[in-house]
């Protein structure tokens, strides 16, 4: 008898195993994931010779030793609505990961139900429609009551939920990196606007000096005309020059106002609480390019880190889609009390226990699972291609910004020599005036070429500062990949 039972059990096991193996839906088509760019492909061209330096440091702006800029950036990071939105996206991604993780855990709920019913005399329970107390039936009306605990657990043997949770955690890590990217964009944006305003202040000072020189020339020519010493042509020429300078002054003042308003919006200041920005000298440009990029660029660019995590999340989603082809197992259980009469509900004899193991085999689904897998794989490959292009774009940013800064540095050296040459001419004119060889007007007007060349030098210095900040941004701005958020 025992041998017969063992034989039956063995036969059932063999049939069950065969069913599990053959009962799964078939994966008709699944391509391999696309390849990601290799680190050795992340390098600059050999003809980019900007001075080598280390990677930018965290809070890079503090190295500029400008308290005004420090205060502006601190206010931006504490009051930016854009940054607040990014942090809310972090919270949303975290809550989504928690939600998916909770769905894979043991679920327990208290259950209470009251069902007042009239049993049909012609239905399956027709005997209970009789009013026969001797037989234990007092129909047709009954009040069924049920109280107890209901529990359910998805065993997730193939990792459907586990991979979905991993994908959600990857999306959360991507959101963390995106927040860092927003911070980098805000800090560099504030610094660029701030130094653009400082350059405008210095340009305004040079234009006002130019106007003073031309104003002196206007008065000198006017005096000569009044005394009949020269024609009116030089006088009107000087007047035209001063009007042109006035036009430039008005334009620069407009630029200062526009830059201030752009800065106000970026730092989140209101109409009456915008801090006063006092003129300061432009900082020295010291940004260079690291000796090598490779893995470091991937780890130091927050946007690339975000893309990398999105790629990983997409691969986890593919794993989840593949796991749907396999059988799923779950267990449900109930323990409580059930009675068709309220007065007997809490008696010992009303106890009820249900243990319900479940198995679901995907046999025929009309191609739904394959379509889902194919679409998920395509989305993952799209993300990989987007990541690859982002890496190439990041290398391009470093190369282009480094080349531009290198060119500006070369132009600045030549322009500085040009300024020095015009200053020599001015000093010669002043010396000639001191010896009585030229007029004071000629000595004063010799200052104009110097001011013009100093303006050109200022424009180059301004562009160099802005470009160095842009290069620093393309190198990650001191960002380093944060510790990975993992499932606890």
From Swiss-Prot:
A lipid is attached at residue 24 (N-palmitoyl cysteine). A lipid is attached at residue 24 (S-diacylglycerol cysteine). Residues 1-23 form the signal peptide. One of its GO terms (molecular function) is efflux transmembrane transporter activity. It is a lipid-anchor. It is found in: Cell outer membrane. GO terms for cellular component: cell outer membrane. The keyword Magnesium does not apply. It holds the Pfam family OEP. GO terms for biological process: response to antibiotic. InterPro entries: OMF (IPR050737), OMP_efflux (IPR003423), RND_efflux_OM_lipoprot_NodT (IPR010131). Keywords: Antibiotic resistance, Cell outer membrane, Lipoprotein, Membrane, Palmitate, Signal, Transmembrane, Transmembrane beta strand. Could be involved in resistance to puromycin, acriflavine and tetraphenylarsonium chloride. Could be part of a tripartite efflux system composed of MdtN, MdtO and MdtP. Belongs to the outer membrane factor (OMF) (TC 1.B.17) family. This is Multidrug resistance outer membrane protein MdtP. It comes from Shigella flexneri. The lineage of its organism: Bacteria, Pseudomonadati, Pseudomonadota, Gammaproteobacteria, Enterobacterales.
